[in-house]
């Protein structure tokens, strides 16, 4: 049977070390398919706060290293995710094994549980459309969602057509459109100053993407201790009762008695 194992390094150091050793024995060739060197895997494990492991009948099929990143707010960052290609097969007993998507979903579920603002990762160029399909978006894309979708479609088409020149041109458009200011702020010491150098850097390190959790509305008609928090939201209004104050949606015109 397949399952996703979650290990918090601070709370379970012994278990974390045990699985880390198992991952290092198998990861470079089997799990990461020779696409990630051993040094980077070791660094990702050492600096991570959590391990997410895809295990099938006692065998590790994939893993993800995740750490807390306090840059620009509270969020968690996936530093590395590897999953064996054999994870897509059906076992002899007819039980399908879990793939990389299950790892992502487990990480998102944990991020939502601990109430982070978003989950981030650096997507290598080949998988940008895949992560977009899972709900990850570019930085500053909320200003132009239509353009983001258009560029993603173009990027996927160029990749499927093996058009490397066109692929780089589209990637350059993405960097210029969504990441010019972002890269200047976060990586100004590591990368060049012009757009071409930023594209090379992005292709090497990956394009930063994030899955943003929608903030839960407080306009639920429940009593509140701090009315000012409700008043800050344009879609909310404060209703004062005899003993309590309530936060409602502005569209709610129904009178509430005995308050």
Regions from the language model: what does each represent?
Residues 216-257:
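Extracellular Cys-Trp
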């Amino acid at each position: 049977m397949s399952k996703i194992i979650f290990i918090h390094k601070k709370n379970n150091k012994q278990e974390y070390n045990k699985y880390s050793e198992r991952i290092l024995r198998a990861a470079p060739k089997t799990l990461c398919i020779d696409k990630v060197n051993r040094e980077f895997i070791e660094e990702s494990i050492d600096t991570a706060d959590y391990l997410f492991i895809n295990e099938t009948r006692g065998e590790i099929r994939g893993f993800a290293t995740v750490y807390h990143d306090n840059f620009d707010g509270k969020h968690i960052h996936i530093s590395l995710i590897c999953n064996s290609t054999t994870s897509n097969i059906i076992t002899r007993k007819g039980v399908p094994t879990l793939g990389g998507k299950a790892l992502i979903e487990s990480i998102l579920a944990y991020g939502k549980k601990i109430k982070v603002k978003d989950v981030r990762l650096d997507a290598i160029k080949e998988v940008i459309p895949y992560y977009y399909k899972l709900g990850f978006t570019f930085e500053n894309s909320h200003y132009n969602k239509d353009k983001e979708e258009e560029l993603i479609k173009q990027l996927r088409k160029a990749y499927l057509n093996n058009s490397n020149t066109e692929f780089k041109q589209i990637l350059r458009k993405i960097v210029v459109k969504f990441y010019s200011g972002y890269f200047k702020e976060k990586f100004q010491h590591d990368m060049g100053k012009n757009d071409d150098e930023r594209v090379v850097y992005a292709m090497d390190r990956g394009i930063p993407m994030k899955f943003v959790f929608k903030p839960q509305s407080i306009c639920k008609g429940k009593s509140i201790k701090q009315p000012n928090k409700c008043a800050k939201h344009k879609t909310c209004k404060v209703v004062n009762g005899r003993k309590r104050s309530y936060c409602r949606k502005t569209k709610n015109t129904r009178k509430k008695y005995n308050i």
